[in-house]
Amino acid sequence: MTEQAEDALPISFTDAAALKVKTLLDEEENDALKLRVYVTGGGCSGFQYGFTFDEKVNEGDFTVEKQGVQLVVDPMSLQYLVGGEVDYTSGLEGSRFFVKNPNATTTCGCGASFSV
């Protein structure tokens, strides 16, 4: 799937998330890496979010670009993430990527798992 106008995207990511991805890519010295977001079964609420760096974009993957970096989501995960936003936070509890997901009916305390 190709990039679309930002207001029509099924998932987006914040400037903070894009900046952190860019920083990590610069450290790795590999501009081919993309942030892949996925959903798997598990966690205390039924589903959990996962983040990894990947050089490949598979057939059917959705990609969106911001500040020169790409976010990639597989079709199965995308159905649970429509309308969501990937963000990055750094604070007293540590630093992490997280998903603001309007489809989640419940989330765990740490925000890493959810149910729909």
From Swiss-Prot:
Keywords: Iron, Iron-sulfur, Metal-binding. Its cofactor is iron-sulfur cluster. It holds the Pfam family Fe-S_biosyn. Homodimer. Iron-sulfur cluster binds at residues 44, 108, 110. Belongs to the HesB/IscA family. One of its GO terms (molecular function) is 2 iron, 2 sulfur cluster binding. It comes from Shewanella piezotolerans (strain WP3 / JCM 13877). Required for insertion of 4Fe-4S clusters for at least IspG. Binds 1 iron-sulfur cluster per subunit. The keyword Membrane does not apply. PROSITE patterns: HESB. One of its GO terms (biological process) is iron-sulfur cluster assembly. The gene is erpA. This is Iron-sulfur cluster insertion protein ErpA. The keyword Metal-binding applies. GO terms for cellular component: cytosol.
